[in-house]
């Protein structure tokens, strides 16, 4: 028979296999194996492109070449430098630690406080804010580029290994590294997760928040091949008997390179064949294979519909009508009340994985079947006789082993010979051809021997598999390869799948060695990551094999490390190119040229000095000398000048009218100018009206023109937003706050020669801080002369504070003033009880101020009886009230029945603008005062314009009487020259910190004795005067303080600390410890902590941009933050109204007699889902404002009476609101040229209302966004409801707190509350053990997470966000990534807004934020637990 041609054939089998690199070697002859063979045959095993194995003897192999060594030497080995090796090892260690911690955090995830988003919300967030988020990463993490190259590389390598261990693909990871700066691992996860969503591409990563599977589960997932039909996993560990397989007949021709594991050789596929696609495979999978047929189970129906939609997506039928129908079904299911999206998604994810695995397994099966069919068509078959003959010979010569399937090989060989007869002797030529084909197939014969000293690898494999899972087994299929040896295939199987391992290039001498060899491959390839195998237990030859495998693996890893190192180097270098140059950075970090730059003292030119000298000697100046010489201060001119020249500090105590504020600065200026000396004198005043009026007066007395910012006048002034002076002006009147800001600039104080601090007795925060500055200035600037002046000065205290400084006392020039007290007034009018009528009285609430210092309370009963006996005021008269009827009656009496010499000008002292407006309205209602030719009414208040304030100094025409309604502005510093009569209510309004409410409030309190004296003195400046005090002499003598309490002791220390930080005076405790009346260190520390929480101070106690705004607002820091955030979120009207009401007091009147009706009226302002007492107050304010601004409807009084509204509080609220809006405008937070107002269209206690531009007030009607702003400002004042204990407790300290029944969130409303969190304004203590709150605002998880706190630790890697000690969990990674982007955008936008208020949020961005935050996504768990 003609010799058959040798046909090249593929070395792959008809099923998926796993192969390793081929190894060629010749083996020593086995005596039993070559027994009976033809000795003249010579075998050649010659791999292509490798090496030759030649057999020079009659045995099968004699000369052996180590195939492993050739494999290692044939290629260029990769190398990495020592530094990279250290970086890799460190990164590997760090990554293992991180992954261990990450898996622990995943296991500890809780089902409480879980936050979710809809798919539409996620897409909306990503489309709107993702680009801004990426831009913010470049700015926030630019600092990472300043670290060393090796540190950045180590960080990226650690992050790479960690992300890969978490389930992300390598391509995704390096895509993130290349696209964004060097950021945290959570930011990288956010980028990768959202990148797939943006591009609508499925993610290949397996990352999720599910608990990581056990080793058994992970191992079974690796066995991803389908199990064969009717082939259950064996229950024992013995090897499976040899099975005849058609693949034994395939001629093996290896490729140039080893095929990867579990891959089918491409050479088996025809040129025209293409791999099966998923859509093609899907047609073979019946649709009825989808489970979940329960029509009453929403979760099952949800999963079934989603799987059908998945099939359509794979089949590219997403736009079909069927897909739209399924989408509608899905929406119908998810809209059901009992539907749980979280539970349904968990079930669907598991079902999707099972479905895709089944689809992949079917694809692999169909591909293998197709390949087998092609092989059969090609007719590649071998003679079965030669195969059986070789099998017979090999079986007869194999070594015995307990686990081997060949224990009785010889007997079976005889049986085969008997059964087959003479079949082996037929056609010897064909047998020879078949053997030649096998020998030319380029196999590698591995000459291993069995060493009984060690444990067989197959036994070790079964043992290790059993340790992972008892049902995991290894089965072997061993096949002879001609006469040269055996190959074995290993099937590692569990209950869900299998994995096939084989080496198609390597042949072993015996079947047992073949099974052990493939077991070594399985141990190396599959088991290395699950168990640590001791190589000492193996036979010597297999130790060497495993060592070779390890070397190969090490080289592979080394090549992979070199590849990763190269990629990381490229990425880091590209990041360095993106970093701003050092020149640019230094330019950005450089300070502004005009800040802190001192040009030194500038001496005016001689021509200007001569001009000033001529002015001081001019006729206009001489005219005022007669008046000036009559002032008591003129008598001390030389004494004062000598004292200033001879000492650095001088204290002057001058009574009212002595001329200290006008004359002493003029003395110093005149003396220096006439002597040719250039001076720069600053005079500080507590109020802007004082500074302006004094500057005008002194300029006039010195013969000059009114102050100007252009011409070089002798006198000028500088107040906030108004400056009329030049750098050469020698005498400048400034407010105390303005001078403090001048000190902040830098070395400007070097140009000042004289500093005069006036009205120091008022003890404002600014004046006390300036006194602390004086202590430093005296030491650092010896050339500086300082004068401290006051009318009611505690001289001894100030002398002690400044260590025995000089004191000059100047008597006042005043005329006698007749003082009448309340008992005198009542007795003069015959004790008319009409003055005691409650209507028209404004009761002073004692609860709003501390009485320990204000009222000298007497606790014992005998003392109280003594007070009743000594006080001459009738019992029917309420002395704790402002009696408006008495004020009007006094005015009428003064102008009609009183002495005409006291009726030229009457000054009435009132607490605030609302009282001024009320008295003005009552006066104008009287017919006698409507004649404007006979009576002129003026108002004096800080909110009025400068022109209106200056008008009070005008002298009315002859025959016209003058009435001035003023606050305590007219006490000192401002002298109205024609005042002859004073009506003193004895009350002033001041900001006072209520330690019980933990809140600062504007409070009406009685004045001090010094204040009362100053007020009465206003009537005796030009002639003999008269003063009516509307308080009793007994109250004045026994309950009034001697001096006013300093602001530093009665204000919230947060404001004091902010002012200290604003002035850059150094450590707060050191600075305040040097104050004239230092506060306690405990209160200072508490204030610092609060400011840290608000965000006004940084971690190193530096003033933040937000802190600078808060320091300029006259309210508490928390309330100031409401104003700032109100500007940011464009709800200015609501924010300013709420802050004003919290500062003034509740707009509701209390009714002891009819509490139920009052509470019902209050709740009538509530709208649907109103869960905030503060928002309820705002609704009441809006209703009152609407009544006043509408020409129709009920009048103000009847409406207020019906709704139990406090009109005085509402009027004061509107006045303070206008003032706050002016402050916001000055700080550029409110982008309006001026605060517009509109007049009331009805007769109202409030004449004008603020008008907010519409572009700044978009969201005042959105209650949810208002609640978010309130919560963000009051944080950490948050309460959480405890289900188990059924009580409210603080979020930070878990302290039990009660909510009073007056709150809209009281206990009776708990079942109706969709959230378990509330914010509170202040917490009060009671005589009971617990504490309570009464003004609360409900907060949602979204509002807490998106708007509250300074920094949220958003850990996308574990699906949680930490807000201080409070943890929120996310439903899935998409929710976590989306909310992380949204929170980052809000934080970045806020910082930009604080830095540049003109950079406001776009309305489109704000709309998305409001929609996300405002949705009531509370869930039903809270309500369910409450009902249980």
UniProtKB/Swiss-Prot annotation:
Binding site residues for ATP: 654-661
Biased composition (Polar residues): 16-33, 256-265
One Gene Ontology molecular-function label: RNA helicase activity
Start-end of Basic and acidic residues biased regions: 34-51
Keyword Plastid included in the entry's annotation: no
Residue span of motif DEAH box: 758-761
Stretches assigned to the Helicase C-terminal domain: 886-1064
Main location group: cytoplasm
GO biological process: cytoplasmic translational initiation
Subcellular location field: Cytoplasm
Keywords: ATP-binding, Cytoplasm, Helicase, Hydrolase, Nucleotide-binding
Source taxon at top rank: Eukaryota
A cellular component annotation (GO) from this entry: cytosol
Keyword Cytoplasm: yes
EC annotation from Swiss-Prot or TrEMBL: 3.6.4.-
Annotated segments matching region Disordered: 1-53, 249-274, 377-413
Residue ranges occupied by any Helicase ATP-binding domain in the UniProt entry: 641-811
Family classification: Belongs to the helicase family. SKI2 subfamily.
PANTHER family, per the entry: ATP-DEPENDENT RNA HELICASE, ATP-DEPENDENT RNA HELICASE DHX57-RELATED
Protein name: Uncharacterized helicase C15C4.05
Species the sequence originates in: Schizosaccharomyces pombe (strain 972 / ATCC 24843) (Fission yeast)
Source species taxonomy: Eukaryota, Fungi, Dikarya, Ascomycota, Taphrinomycotina
């Amino acid at each position: 028979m003609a010799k058959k041609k040798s046909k090249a054939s593929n070395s792959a089998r008809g099923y998926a296999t796993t192969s390793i690199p081929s190894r060629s070697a010749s083996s020593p002859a086995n005596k039993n194996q070559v027994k009976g063979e033809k000795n003249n045959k010579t075998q050649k095993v010659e791999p292509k492109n490798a090496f030759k194995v030649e057999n020079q003897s009659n045995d099968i192999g004699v000369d052996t070449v180590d195939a492993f060594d050739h494999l290692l030497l044939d290629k260029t080995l990769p190398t990495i430098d020592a530094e990279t090796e250290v970086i890799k090892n460190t990164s590997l260690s760090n990554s293992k630690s991180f992954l261990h911690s990450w898996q622990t955090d995943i296991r500890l995830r809780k089902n409480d406080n879980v936050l979710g988003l809809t798919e539409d919300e996620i897409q909306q967030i990503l489309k709107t804010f993702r680009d801004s988020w990426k831009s913010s990463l470049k700015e926030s993490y630019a600092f990472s580029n300043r670290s060393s190259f090796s540190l950045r590389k180590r960080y990226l390598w650690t992050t790479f290994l960690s992300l890969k261990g978490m389930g992300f693909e390598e391509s995704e990871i390096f895509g993130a590294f290349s696209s964004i700066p060097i950021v945290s691992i959570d930011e990288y996860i956010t980028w990768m997760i959202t990148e797939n969503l943006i591009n609508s591409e499925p993610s290949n990563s397996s990352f999720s928040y599910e608990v990581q599977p056990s080793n058994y589960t992970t191992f079974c997932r690796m066995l991803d091949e389908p199990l064969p039909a009717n082939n259950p996993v064996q229950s024992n560990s013995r090897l499976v008997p040899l099975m005849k397989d058609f693949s034994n007949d395939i001629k093996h021709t290896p490729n140039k390179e080893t095929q990867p594991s579990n891959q089918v050789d491409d050479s088996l596929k025809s040129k025209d064949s293409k791999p099966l696609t998923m859509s093609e495979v899907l047609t073979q999978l019946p649709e009825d294979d989808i489970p979940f047929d329960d029509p009453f189970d929403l979760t099952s129906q949800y999963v079934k519909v989603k799987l059908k939609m998945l099939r359509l997506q794979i089949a590219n039928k997403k736009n079909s009508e069927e897909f739209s129908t399924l989408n509608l079904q899905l929406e119908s299911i998810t809209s059901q009340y009992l539907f749980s999206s979280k539970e349904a998604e968990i079930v669907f994810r598991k079902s999707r994985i099972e479905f895709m695995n089944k689809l992949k397994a079917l694809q692999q099966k169909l591909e293998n079947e197709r390949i087998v069919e092609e092989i059969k068509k090609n007719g590649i078959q071998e003679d079965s006789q030669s195969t059986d003959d070789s099998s017979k010979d090999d079986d007869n010569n194999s070594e015995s082993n307990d686990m081997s399937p060949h224990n009785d090989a010889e007997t079976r060989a005889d049986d085969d010979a008997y059964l087959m007869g003479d079949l082996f002797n037929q056609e010897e030529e064909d047998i020879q051809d078949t053997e030649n084909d096998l020998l030319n197939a380029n196999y590698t014969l591995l000459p291993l021997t069995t060493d009984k000293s060690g444990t067989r690898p197959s036994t070790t494999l079964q043992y290790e598999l059993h340790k992972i899972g008892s049902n995991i087994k290894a089965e072997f299929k061993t096949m002879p390869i001609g006469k040269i040896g055996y190959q074995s295939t290993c099937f590692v199987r569990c209950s869900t799948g299998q994995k096939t391992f084989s080496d198609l290039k390597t042949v072993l001498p015996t079947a047992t060695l073949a099974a052990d060899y493939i077991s070594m491959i399985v141990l190396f390839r599959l088991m290395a990551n699950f168990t640590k195998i001791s190589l000492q237990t193996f036979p010597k030859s297999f130790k060497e094999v495993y060592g070779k495998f390890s070397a190969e693996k090490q080289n592979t890893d080394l090549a992979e490390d070199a590849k990763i190192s190269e990629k990381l180097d490229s990425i880091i270098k590209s990041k360095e190119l993106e970093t701003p140059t050092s020149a640019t950075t230094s330019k950005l970090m450089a300070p502004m040229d005009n800040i802190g730059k001192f040009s030194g003292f500038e001496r005016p030119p001689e021509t200007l000095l001569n001009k000033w000298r001529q002015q001081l000697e001019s006729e206009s100046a001489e005219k005022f000398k007669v008046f000036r010489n009559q002032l008591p201060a003129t008598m001390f001119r030389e004494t004062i000048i000598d004292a200033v020249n001879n000492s650095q500090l001088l204290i002057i105590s001058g009574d009212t009218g002595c001329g200290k504020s006008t004359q002493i600065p003029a003395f110093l200026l005149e003396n220096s100018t006439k002597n040719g000396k250039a001076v720069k004198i600053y005079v500080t005043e507590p109020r802007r009206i004082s500074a302006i009026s004094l500057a005008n007066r002194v300029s006039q007395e010195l013969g000059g023109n009114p102050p100007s910012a252009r011409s070089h006048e002798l006198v000028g002034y500088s107040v906030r937003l108004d400056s009329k002076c030049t750098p050469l002006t020698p005498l400048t009147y400034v407010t105390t706050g303005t001078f403090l800001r001048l000190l902040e600039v830098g070395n400007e104080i070097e140009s000042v020669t004289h500093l005069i601090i006036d009205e120091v007795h008022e003890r404002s925060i600014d004046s006390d801080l300036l006194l602390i500055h004086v202590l430093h200035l005296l030491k650092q600037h010896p050339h500086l002369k300082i004068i401290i002046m006051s009318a009611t000065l505690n001289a001894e205290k100030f002398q002690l504070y400044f260590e025995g400084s000089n004191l000059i006392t100047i008597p006042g020039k005043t005329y006698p003033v007749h003082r009448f007290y309340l008992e005198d007034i009542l007795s003069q009018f015959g004790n008319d009880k009409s003055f005691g009528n409650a209507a028209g009285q404004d009761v002073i609430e004692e609860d709003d101020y501390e009485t320990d210092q204000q009222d000298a309370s007497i606790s014992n009963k005998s003392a109280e009886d003594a007070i009743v006996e000594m006080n001459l005021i009738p019992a029917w008269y309420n002395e704790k009230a402002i009696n408006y009827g008495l004020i009007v009656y006094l005015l009428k009496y003064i102008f009609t029945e009183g002495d005409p010499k006291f009726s030229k000008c009457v000054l009435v002292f009132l607490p605030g603008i609302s009282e001024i407006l009320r008295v003005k309205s009552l006066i104008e209602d009287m017919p006698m005062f409507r004649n404007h030719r006979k009576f002129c009414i003026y108002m004096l208040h800080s909110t009025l314009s400068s022109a209106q304030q200056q008008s009070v100094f005008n002298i009315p025409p002859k025959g016209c009487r003058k009435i001035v309604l003023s606050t305590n502005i007219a006490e000192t510093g401002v002298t109205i020259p024609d005042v002859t009569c004073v009506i003193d209510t004895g009350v002033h309004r001041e900001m006072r910190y209520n330690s019980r409410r933990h809140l600062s409030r504007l409070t009406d309190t009685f004045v001090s004795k010094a204040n009362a004296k100053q007020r009465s003195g206003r009537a005796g400046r030009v002639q003999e005067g008269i003063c009516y005090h509307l308080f009793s002499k007994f109250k004045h003598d026994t309950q009034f303080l001697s001096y006013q309490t300093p602001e530093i002791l009665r204000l919230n220390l947060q404001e004091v600390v902010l002012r200290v930080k604003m002035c850059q005076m150094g450590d707060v405790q050191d600075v305040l410890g040097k104050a004239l009346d230092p506060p306690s260190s405990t209160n200072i520390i508490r204030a610092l902590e609060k400011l840290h929480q608000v965000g006004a101070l940084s971690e190193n106690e530096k003033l933040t941009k937000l802190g600078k705004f808060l320091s300029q607002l006259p309210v508490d820091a928390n309330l100031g933050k409401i104003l700032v955030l109100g500007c940011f979120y464009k709800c200015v009207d609501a924010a300013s109204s709420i802050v004003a009401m919290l500062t003034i007091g509740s707009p509701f009147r209390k009714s002891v007699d009819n509490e139920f009706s009052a509470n019902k009226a209050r709740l009538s302002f509530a709208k649907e889902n109103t869960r905030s007492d503060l928002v309820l107050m705002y609704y009441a304010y809006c209703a009152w404002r609407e009544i006043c601004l509408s020409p129709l409807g009920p009048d103000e009084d009847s409406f207020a009476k019906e709704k139990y509204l406090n009109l005085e509080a509402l009027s004061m609220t509107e006045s303070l609101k206008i003032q706050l809006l002016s402050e916001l405008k000055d700080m550029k937070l409110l982008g309006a040229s001026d605060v517009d107002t509109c007049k009331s269209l009805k007769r109202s206690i409030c004449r004008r209302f603020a008008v907010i531009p519409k572009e700044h007030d978009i969201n005042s009607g959105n209650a949810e966004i208002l609640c978010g702003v309130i919560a963000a400002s009051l944080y950490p004042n948050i309460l959480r409801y405890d289900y188990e204990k059924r009580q409210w407790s603080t979020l930070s300290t878990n302290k039990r707190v009660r909510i009073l029944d007056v709150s809209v969130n009281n206990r009776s409303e708990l079942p109706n509350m969709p959230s378990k969190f509330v914010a509170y304004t202040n917490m009060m203590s009671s005589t009971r053990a617990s504490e309570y709150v009464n003004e609360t605002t409900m907060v949602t998880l979204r509002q807490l997470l998106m708007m509250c706190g300074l920094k949220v630790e958003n850990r996308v890697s574990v699906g949680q966000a930490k807000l201080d000690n409070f943890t929120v969990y996310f439903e899935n990674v998409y929710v976590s990534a989306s909310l992380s982007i949204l929170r980052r955008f809000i934080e970045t936008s806020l910082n930009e807004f604080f830095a540049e208020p003109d950079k406001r949020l776009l309305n489109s961005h704000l709309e998305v934020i409001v929609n996300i935050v405002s949705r009531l996504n509370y869930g039903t768990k809270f309500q369910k637990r409450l009902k249980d």
